[in-house]
Amino acid sequence: MPSLVRRFQHASTEEQPFELNIQMESPPLVMYGNPDVSSGALASGLAKLTVFPADLKCESIVMEFVRIISTKRPLRDSCPDCKAQVEAFEKWEFSKEPTVYTHGTHTWPFTFIIPGHFPQTTNSPFINVTYILKTRVKIPSQPDFVFEYPLNLKRSIVTNADKIAQRLFPPTSLIALLELPPVIHPLSCVPVEFQLTGVKPENSKVGWRLTKISWRIEEQIKAQINGCSTHTGTKKPYIFKETRLLGNNEHKSGWKEDGDRIIFEIPISTSLLSKPICDVSFDGQFSLYIAHQLILETIVVEVMNSHPINSNARILRMKVNLPLTERGGLGVSWDEECPPMFNSVGPSPPAYEQVARSSPTDIPLPPPSCPTNVQRD
């Protein structure tokens, strides 16, 4: 199976007669499972240096895997440590000593594992999380050349069993039941089965009629921005809270009544223009919490003999946590991949020693056979 190849390069100029290229050979970087149980993502690729007609002398070539957590609202605008937290986790020294590279392409392979507890790449209104491969090339009598290749790290939670949520509404006899997928994905439409039981209680002339069902998906963002180690305590941390509407709809018909219960399948989805952000949670100098909820509201009217009673209506509201993650693809993490099995391959050919010992002269020949149908004169 051919590998997935992604390239990103920096074009050369007349003052800089070389080109840097990062070729990723690993599949998309997806961490499967929650942060406390995920095994992370495996990244591998090639770093390529293409030198044009003139030889290139480099003092060193170093590449690092860097995570940058930045904010748009720092406590101190003039302090770079208050604006961003930069950490390097992996380092490759492709060239430690001064080396002359001739015309052509020079490659260095690299591979590393991104821990599963790392937050995925996130772009929120308050805090951003980015990952890059940062390559630094030192050339004599010239400023250092820095090349940054962005990495898109995702998280996916793969589960098969649906989630069931139940809610009682005392003092009425109504019971609401929701059966929905355990997670949803951005820009996807998923079915949610809604059941409302107790609309026609036994031995009672009073019942309930469903008039409207409405739903909405909300995204809750909570962020706390602290100062760096130098400015901690000089100002109070900034705390931000925001609730965004990702999708909503309402229905006034379409459900089915089956005796004492009402059944309705509701398609829910996020809007194309909402730009949802996947669930994420981490603490530290920059703390961020993003979660999603499905809010379902139904309006029921009390009736007697199919006639309303003094317009006695009730609003029944349910809130269910609805995690939003990226699609899982094959859903197999790097540590669960099994090597190919070749059960159909036959035994290996004989060794050369056995062939040399059994030469053709050692093989006995069968005795000659005499013809039996020869007539003599």
UniProtKB/Swiss-Prot annotation:
InterPro entries linked: Arrestin-like_C, Ig_E-set, LDB19_N
GO molecular function terms attached to this record: protein-macromolecule adaptor activity; ubiquitin protein ligase binding
Record-linked Gene3D superfamilies: 2.60.40.640
Record SUPFAM superfamilies: E set domains
Domain of life of the source: Eukaryota
Coiled coil: none
GO CC terms in record: clathrin-coated vesicle; cytoplasm; cytosol; nucleus
One Gene Ontology biological process: ubiquitin-dependent endocytosis
Pfam families: LDB19
Region Disordered, residue ranges: 345-377
Protein name listed in UniProt: Uncharacterized protein C1F12.05
